[in-house]
Amino acid sequence: SVPDCGTGPGLIIGQEIFGVNKTMRQIADYFAEEGYVVLVPDMFWRLTERVELAYNEKDFKTAFGYFGKFDLDLAIEDISISMDKLKSLDECTGSVGYMGFCLGGKLAYLTASKLEPEVAISFYGVGIPEMLDQGNNVTCPMIFHCPELDEWMPPEGVKALRNAFESRDDIEIYDYPGADH
């Protein structure tokens, strides 16, 4: 998605386990309206192309199957390629951030620790507490959005996240009481 003004900073949107579905496209369009050049890469392309699942029990099982086969290292390579591609576009003014949801939220954390985005934002990222050893490698400002009732990031995980980054002024963690994944 490209803003009406034609140019802007780059933003990569990291998909949930449901693929590049209507919700991810709507988020991309919203941020394009706000002035960003947005790319939503298909992170499941190695498993099957164009995964677009709904938020129902049947599709959740399918999504979880893809998630179980997902290779994080290859995903980071794909994100690196996506960042380079976005930066090369005439429409992109050069800086690129990464914002992800669920699986994409986990990838936001890994992108911040392994690549060099301008900023990274994680919405209900899964499995981050198990990867806190990567925290010293985060080189950009980062925001974590953590729902209180998220079974994939329980309160003890959020506490560990806070403890890991308590000395970092450039990392913010927001809680959402009563909210679920």
Task: Name these PLM-found stretches.
Residues 1-181:
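N-terminal cap/leader regions of alpha/beta-hydrolase-fold enzymes
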